[in-house]
Amino acid sequence: MNNTISPGEVLKVIKERIENFDNQVKSDSVGEVISIKDGIALIYGLEKAKFGEVVVFANGITGIVLGLDCDTASVVVFGDERSVGEGDTAKCTGKLMDVPVGLELLGRVVDALGNPIDGAGSIDSKTRLPVEIKAPGIIARQSVTEPLQTGIKIIDMLIPIGRGQRELIIGDRKTGKTAIAIDTIINQKAHNDVVSEKEKVYCIYVAIGQKNSSVARIVDKLRVSGALEYTIVVAAGASDTVSFQYLAPYAACAMGEFFRDNGMHCLIVYDDLSKHAVAYRQMSLLLRRPPGREAYPGDVFFLHSRLLERAAKMSDKEGGGSLTALPIIETQAGDVSAYVPTNVISITDGQIFLESEIFYKGLRPAVNVGLSVSRVGSAAQTKSVKKVAGSVKLSLAQYRELEDFAKFGSDIDVHSQKVLDRGRRMMELLKQKQYSPLSVPEQVAVIFAGTSGCLDGVSVSDISRFEEMLLKELNENYPDVLSSILNNFTDDVKDLLLEIIGKVTSNFE
């Protein structure tokens, strides 16, 4: 038996090996940690690093490049900095920071990286989107035309919000800012229960620098009210590093853009951007960027403008989806002229201004109607709301003016006294308990009772009881009237509503 191998066979094997030889050399940009403190790692050797690029450390923790010098890169660490030490290797990934997005995140509580923190298992999301993305251009947008109902009378009637709008909620601490945002999320349930998946309003609540106990309480309230099923909660608590607090709103916005860009509707609440600006200031100072006014870096305006500009009502060509933003700003002693508040006021399409003085008077929601404005929302109001709410703002302004005058104890003529009496009743009508949103027809019926003069004979102390009785009467005995108000508030419907209001007011004579 001949076991010799011919030179031809050897040559054939060598040729095959040469042809199939993969000579690709993989090039990695690898550096070494030369110092780490306060969540900032200084890395030497990342010559090909780009601004905003994701870096992976030897132990698997990620970071993002936010500073580049001639031979070093400053990387903000996402995670426990104690597990990163001097001499550790760090590698560029060539990718920008992205997060999981999609319907799979609904009903879950996640951190700024999209990792679940609610103990309910992993999230099987098939799509990821970058956290930083350019806002839609002018051509890709359309005007705000659809209303976003909050369920709060004073807002839906006087400071209406439309889908795709950015409406700032601003006020001192403990004046009910978060309460308005949570009520708005809860109010979407009634709408979502009766419409298709495409028409639902999905919600995202972003907690930035909040106490974990406060976030847990909000999540529990959303769960009890049935709102968590269409809501994503993104939490970067006070105990989390500033890097997570900085990233959270951008990550949440990317999650919201998934709905917007797929022809769906989304509401996002940033609670709050004051703490976000403080986190960014701390990070910028650690990165040795030059401080400006109030020690904020020079690009603090761009910090929020590039975030809020991503909220938009898309054109029909782009799917017609929307992303509505409700940023929250906390003021100090009612000072709206401070640096960050004025920045965000100039970026948004209006503001709901909450005042401590009004809050302590028991007028809640504590909205200052005179200082609050919605620049584009009125175009989205329904016809029935416009008919009823048109005169309310003017009559309240007249009431406030006369109220200040009446404090001097001067004699007041009959007409002025009538304005004062009706104004007091209207202020009482605009009060609303937390977690008790009203539908649009219910709001129209209640406000119409005040503007029509039907309550002139009802004492101010009985107004809240009258409201309860009117809503009970309408829901139990006249549901067709409520649906008529929603569709078209004709004179016939008005007459029937006046009859029902008269029937209820007769109990207070």
Swiss-Prot record:
GO terms for cellular component: plasma membrane; proton-transporting ATP synthase complex. Produces ATP from ADP in the presence of a proton gradient across the membrane. The alpha chain is a regulatory subunit. CDD domains: ATP-synt_F1_alpha_C, ATP-synt_F1_alpha_N, F1-ATPase_alpha_CD. It catalyses: ATP + H2O + 4 H(+)(in) = ADP + phosphate + 5 H(+)(out). Its EC number is 7.1.2.2. GO terms for molecular function: ADP binding; ATP binding; proton-transporting ATP synthase activity, rotational mechanism. This is ATP synthase subunit alpha. It is a peripheral membrane protein. It is found in: Cell inner membrane. F-type ATPases have 2 components, CF(1) - the catalytic core - and CF(0) - the membrane proton channel. CF(1) has five subunits: alpha(3), beta(3), gamma(1), delta(1), epsilon(1). CF(0) has three main subunits: a(1), b(2) and c(9-12). The alpha and beta chains form an alternating ring which encloses part of the gamma chain. CF(1) is attached to CF(0) by a central stalk formed by the gamma and epsilon chains, while a peripheral stalk is formed by the delta and b chains. The keyword Flavoprotein does not apply. Belongs to the ATPase alpha/beta chains family. The record marks S372 as: Required for activity. ATP binds at G171, D172, R173, K174, T175, G176, K177, T178. The keyword Cytoplasm does not apply. It comes from Ehrlichia chaffeensis (strain ATCC CRL-10679 / Arkansas). It is an enzyme of class 7 (translocase). Keywords: ATP synthesis, ATP-binding, Cell inner membrane, Cell membrane, CF(1), Hydrogen ion transport, Ion transport, Membrane, Nucleotide-binding, Translocase, Transport.
